[in-house]
């Protein structure tokens, strides 16, 4: 897999503990390798105002959130498929980590894993089996990356 699978757009001020581009690439590339996917995604780091506007426009929820995943709906190319966009609010991720007494890096990893799984077709809306399936995968990847289970 080449290194041209991730396009990162930074539209916010970066915090001291925002992961490096290499860290984002490592997490996402590892997930793709696990699923034997050769794909591309866009990762956009934004301010609260932008993610709130996107959440309202696309999900009809009038509040900011930590991450939004926008899967791409178009025919797959045999060589490379574009999975979609992840939009993350750095400020919210870092505040959540602090409020939940988690390391900022492990929470970032969890959020990126969660969003990438959404782009791969995993969902957790109103189905306990789907929620459990997604959480098991999140925990598996977090453990692989050296982080603890975020649900305990």
From Swiss-Prot:
Protein EC: 3.1.-.-
Classification via InterPro entries: MetalPrtase_cat_dom_sf_prd, YbeY, YbeY_CS
A GO MF label: zinc ion binding
Keyword Metal-binding: yes
UniProt-listed GO biological process terms: rRNA processing
Pfam families: YbeY
Superkingdom field: Bacteria
Record keyword Transmembrane present: no
Binding site for Zn(2+): 114, 118, 124
Cofactor note text: Binds 1 zinc ion.
Function: Single strand-specific metallo-endoribonuclease involved in late-stage 70S ribosome quality control and in maturation of the 3' terminus of the 16S rRNA.
Protein name, entry field: Endoribonuclease YbeY
Organism: Wigglesworthia glossinidia brevipalpis
Gene: ybeY
